[in-house]
From Swiss-Prot:
Protein name according to UniProt: Potassium channel AKT3
One of the record's GO molecular function terms: voltage-gated potassium channel activity
Topological domain ranges for the Cytoplasmic compartment: 1-75, 124-146, 196-209, 310-907
Topology of the protein relative to the lipid bilayer: Multi-pass membrane protein
Biased composition (Low complexity): 754-776
Family label: Belongs to the potassium channel family. Plant (TC 1.A.1.4) subfamily.
Subcellular location, record wording: Membrane
Residues that span the membrane, as ranges: 76-96, 103-123, 147-167, 175-195, 210-230, 289-309
Length: 907
């Protein structure tokens, strides 16, 4: 049941429900007070029923001890306690019978405390067992009466009434007045609260408390000293008579100053000798006072020592750590460079902690939500611009930033060592680093190679972490660096829950590796990845758009063979054919068209592949697209002419017209045409060409202006002459696209398949077979533990019916294509050594059937032999069709067949 938000009143309302025996608690999570004091408020107990007790609605006329107005009342009483703390000992020692203004002030103060006694009967208290506010009036009264009620009442009795109650011999001592010092417990509670209040300095609160304790002790002692001298029968035999023989006639101020002087010299154990105890009573009191001073001095010195030591403890620990590190380095004879790195790192750590730059312990004590918000505020923009995370969702970046740790490193410090195990990678926030490649593990100037430099916003160590291989370089800081460290396990855990973003990260990494052609070690990693892609060992959603953007026709061919949708688009809405046409990659365009890519596909900006090829002068690609039925009418044809006008390209304008472009339509939202643009630019040549191709000189824009009117307003005489002399040409009609049935695949050039050449394929097959033979379990383990292995396994799980997360560009279309299409075709070379022809038997390239039985039946029909087994070229038996890969060479044999090497061995 929802409740309304309300503040706890000083005295709870009198409306309805009075007299209830039980505490009615209406709790709500919206009642949380922003003023809640963590030093005095009641914390809720654990469990679903434990929240909100401190915000309970109390009974009628019951005051919450945490109400702001009650706290102000207590703070006001503190001022009266300070008055009582000074006046009570003073009256006890110097004023036998208070009268006049002093007596009136005492009675006024007593009246305030009497009001507080009455109010206390209506103040709820915290139960020490349940830590809940108890608002039962009877329990409140019983608790108060059995604890501090008697002392509070006695301390409030007026002085005049107390003198009448006491016997005549004790009336002058004001014993009841001394009981008012009981109120000092309120000051102790105040200091305890201030010590926990973050608005006040703990150091100064403690200092003020110690000063107050010292002054109060000196003041009380001075008053007691004077009381002993004043009440002693022989005034000349007292401590004050040596300094002031007729002290009774001196002013009260002079007597008080003298008493304070002797009290403070005794407390400080100075003892100049001008004042000292004269009688037995003074000696006994002085002895007792000095014993008290021993404890008070120890208390003050101990507290001051703790305060001072606390401020210097960090420096002491730092010096001890530096000394220990230096001793360790010297004891084990470490190189000077390592010693310097150790000392620099420890010094930098001390400085960052002392200046509040890297309070790791404080940061770790915060809840995860607060830590994530802090990291997001500090580093989100930087991580968003890292090349590895270009194009990923903000959700992934937020998750990654939450797992990153900021660290400082001194100059010339090694962050990553070459060939060490990949555990973390780093993003540079500030500073710079150098990447060093060692030869044979020797660090000498003659064998060091500077592989590159890294600056703010760059990543180091990501290749080793993502590919799960030893680090390629040693990363060493050149200046003071602030780095973001990300653990490999945390990164892969996040990627597993964001497969679509993981694919983007993987593509970004592959693109980066391929661009770094000047570094041999990175080139080797890129080649290894390409080989694994070619062998089909990576089952993750690399898109056709990625392959087309890299111009990798072999990878594109492999992906198309797996059944990927040739019309899938990236996150910008561009298909692979758009990208291949824009890059002028004839081989990729041919492959896509052969596999059913739409030659007239349109991106969100209205561009078609033919336009991408035309505007970049890729004539061979243009011809391929035209032969496949492409034209410009499928896109936003009008803006094409405007581009030609702006570029002053008559040849491009002619191509636009020839391929079905529109030169007369509006090319922008304001209704302007390409002819408007030519007139505004004063380009008479382009205007004449447009008019020749059917542009309308009287087409109006949204303002009602025609190209002819614009020419007249601008006073372009040549332009007006062109309009006047131009004859009206009928617009050339765009060539209609051929029907779908008339579109045939692009013919093979010279009868050669447009997939990667057979020689190249054979070379790749042989090389990959050799590489596969050399593969070791360690390399396969590296692959499984790398980013590629994580994406592969996750993609396989999704493909088999597991969780289907969002894909990258065209992921949904590819998923539908995979679910509706048959398994990818596998081509194998088969031969039968037992057929006629002997060892010179010919091989035949066939599509692999779904079962081995089907393959044996196919071989029987081709070779005229009834084979019963399938073996590899190396003589290994094949028991399952799923073991066969594209490009394998298989032998179809009978049970009687013996491999040639075994036959020669038997002979």
């Amino acid at each position: 049941m929802p409740t309304t938000k309300c503040a706890v009143p000083l005295v709870s309302g009198a409306a309805g429900g009075g007299g209830s025996a039980e505490l009615t608690r209406q709790l709500s999570s919206t009642q949380a007070s922003p003023r809640f004091s963590f030093s005095s408020g009641v914390l809720p107990s654990l469990g679903s029923r434990g929240g909100g007790e401190r915000h309970a609605r109390l009974r009628r006329f019951i005051v919450s001890p945490y109400d702001r107005r009650y706290e102000l009342w207590n703070n006001y009483l503190i001022l009266l306690v300070v008055y009582s703390a000074w006046v009570t000992p003073f009256e006890f020692g110097f004023v036998p019978e208070p009268a006049g203004a002093l007596a009136a002030a005492d009675n006024a103060v007593n009246a305030f405390f009497a009001v507080d006694i009455v109010l206390t009967f209506f103040v709820a208290y915290t139960d020490p067992k349940t830590f809940l506010l108890q608002d039962d009036p009877r329990k409140i009264a019983l608790r108060y009466i059995t604890t501090w009620f008697v002392l509070d009442v006695v301390a409030t009795i007026p002085t005049e009434l107390a003198r009448r109650i006491l016997p005549p011999d004790l009336r002058s001592y004001g014993f009841f007045g001394i009981l008012r010092l009981w109120r000092l417990h309120r000051v102790g509670i105040l200091f305890a609260r201030l010590e926990k209040d973050r608005k006040f300095s703990y150091f100064w609160v403690r200092c003020v408390k110690l000063v107050c304790v010292t002054l109060f002790a000196v003041h009380c002692s001075a008053c007691f000293y004077y009381l002993l001298a004043d009440r002693y029968p022989d005034p000349t035999n007292t401590w004050i008579s040596a300094y002031m023989p007729n002290f009774h006639k001196a002013s009260i101020w002079s007597r008080y100053v003298a008493s304070m002087y002797w009290s403070i010299t005794t407390l400080s154990t100075v003892g100049y000798g001008d004042m000292h105890a004269e009688n037995t009573g003074e000696m006994v009191f002085t002895t007792t006072y000095m014993l008290f001073n021993l404890g008070l001095t120890a208390y003050i010195i101990g507290n001051m020592t703790n305060l001072v030591v606390h401020g210097t403890s960090r420096t002491r620990k730092f010096r001890d750590m530096i000394q220990a590190a230096t001793s360790f380095a010297q004891r084990h004879q470490l190189p000077a460079r390592l010693q310097e790195q150790m000392v620099s790192h420890l010094s930098l750590k001390f400085r960052t902690n002392s200046e509040g730059l890297h309070q790791q312990e404080t940061f770790e004590a915060l809840p995860k939500a607060i830590k994530s918000s802090i990291s997001h505020h500090l580093f989100f923009g930087l991580v968003q611009n890292v090349y590895l995370f270009e194009g990923v969702s903000n959700d992934l970046i937020f998750q990654l930033v939450s797992e990153m740790n900021a660290e400082y490193f001194a100059p010339r410090e090694d962050i990553i060592l070459q060939n060490e195990a990949p555990a973390d990678f780093y993003i540079i926030v500030s500073g710079s680093m150098e990447l060093i490649e060692l030869h044979n593990g020797i660090e000498q100037a003659s064998v060091l190679t500077l592989a590159g430099m890294a600056k703010s916003g760059d990543v180091v160590g990501e290749i080793g972490v993502l590919c799960y291989r030893p680090q390629l370089f040693t990363a060493r800081t050149r200046s003071l660096c602030q780095l973001l460290r990300l653990d490999r396990a945390a990164f892969l855990r996040i990627i597993q829950s964001n497969i679509a973003d993981g694919t983007i990260v993987m593509n970004n990494l592959i693109q980066y590796l391929r661009e770094k052609k000047e570094i041999a070690s990175i080139v080797a990693v890129a080649k290894e990845i390409d080989d694994m892609l070619a062998r089909g060992q990576m089952d993750f959603p690399i898109t056709l758009c990625f392959a087309a953007s890299k111009g990798d026709s072999f990878l594109l061919h492999q992906l198309l063979k797996r059944g990927l949708d040739p019309n899938e688009s990236d996150h910008y809405g561009r298909t692979a054919l758009h990208i291949a046409a824009s890059n002028g990659n004839e081989q990729c365009v041919r492959l896509l068209l052969e596999n059913g890519a739409d030659s007239n596909s349109r991106d969100p900006e209205g561009r078609v592949p033919l336009w991408e090829a035309l505007c970049r002068r890729h004539q061979t690609v243009v011809q391929l697209l035209v032969d496949a039925g492409a034209d410009l009418s499928g896109g936003d044809a009008a803006p094409y002419a405007r581009v030609a006008v702006e570029q002053n390209d008559a040849a491009l304008l002619g191509e636009i017209v020839r391929h079905g472009g529109d030169v007369s339509g509006a090319c922008s939202g304001d209704g302007t045409t390409a002819l408007h643009r030519a007139v505004l630019d004063g380009n008479v040549q382009m205007a004449r060409l447009l008019l020749e191709h059917g542009a309308d000189a009287d087409a109006e824009d949204v303002n009602g202006l025609t190209p002819r009117a614009v020419a007249e307003q601008g006073g372009h005489a040549d332009m007006q002459l062109a309009f006047a002399s131009a004859t009206r040409h009928e617009p050339r009609k765009a060539r209609p696209p051929p029907p779908a049935s008339a579109i045939v695949p692009v013919p093979l050039r010279d009868g050669v398949d447009s997939s990667p050449s057979s020689s190249s394929r054979r070379g790749r097959t042989s090389s990959t077979s050799a590489a596969s033979a050399r593969s070791t379990p360690q390399r396969m383990a590296n692959f499984r533990n790398s980013l590629f292995g994580v994406i592969s396994s996750s993609h396989a799980f999704h493909h088999e019916g597991g969780y289907r997360g969002g894909g990258g560009g065209g992921g949904a279309a590819a998923e539908r294509e995979r679910s509706s299409s048959s398994p990818p075709l596998v081509r194998v070379a088969i031969s039968c050594p037992e057929s006629r022809g002997g060892k010179d038997h010919s091989s035949k390239l066939v599509f692999m059937p779904e079962t081995l039985r089907g393959l044996l039946e196919l071989g029987a029909a081709r070779f005229g032999v009834s084979p019963t087994r399938v073996v590899t070229s190396g003589g290994a038996d094949v028991d399952d069709a799923r073991l066969v890969r594209d490009g394998d060479h298989l032998l179809l044999v009978t049970d009687k067949w013996v491999p040639p090497e075994n036959r020669s061995r038997n002979q």
